[in-house]
Amino acid sequence: MPENSFISNFKTILKLVVFLIIVGVAFNKIGAKYKAAADKNIINAFTQQRYNEFYEQEPNSIDMVFIGSSHSYCTFDPEIIDPILGTSSWQLGTPLQHYDTSYYVLKEVLNYQKPKKVVLELYWDILKDEFEMKQANTFFEVLKNQSLKDEYIKNVFPLNEKVKYNLFPIRYQQDYFAYEANEIQTKIEEKYGVEKKATPEIVGTEYYRSRGYTFCDVVMPENEYNETNQFKNFDGEDWEFNNVQKKYIKK
């Protein structure tokens, strides 16, 4: 009887191990697929180019850096600013950059350069957030400093976000579903001859230029005014400066 009980328990454990292996393999495959979709994001490509070129610069050849979100890297153009101020500047903004990330961007800059001036772009809608995984991951994708990345995760990530970060399907799900939805729509249109509802023509262009700057003169279509309007239903009395972001700005 004890032997039968042992065999039964062993079979149960074996089944559990096999199940976990299958789940692990499937999870890894899904994660790789999701990451591949994220790699096709053109905004990520601009960020990658911005940082790749920064790492190629001669040490201590940059005396001013711009740090912030897309508001920064689409606004402060070193090609215009440097001839006027006599500076040698670089744009190091990243999409949706929060100020915990700004702090670590500057720490990485100081490993290679000794800028005399640092221009930090502030945006009210980001100042109220405690943490945002996607913007942190965008920075990690271009950061060539594992110890700094580990320090960021240890000091900034809430516990539940540390778990999510190590699971690719969760980390990259936003990129994947945005990419996949577009692919599915295109295939349906081609297969069934379905005509999608006409959307306003996008006026303007966006491209990476130089020294971290991204040129963008795209005009927002009218149909997006309500969808992306951050001031819609906004009451300034309810706005609060998040303590986490405040802490990193004060640093």
Predicted regions and their residues:
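Short, flexible loop segments at the rims of nucleotide/cofactor-binding pockets, characterized by
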Residues: 40-45, 67-68, 94-98, 240-241
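Hydrophobic membrane-insertion alpha-helices, especially the h-region
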Residues: 11-32
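Membrane-embedded segments
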Residues: 67, 71-158
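A short, well-structured juxtamembrane/interface segment
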Residues: 49-55, 244-251
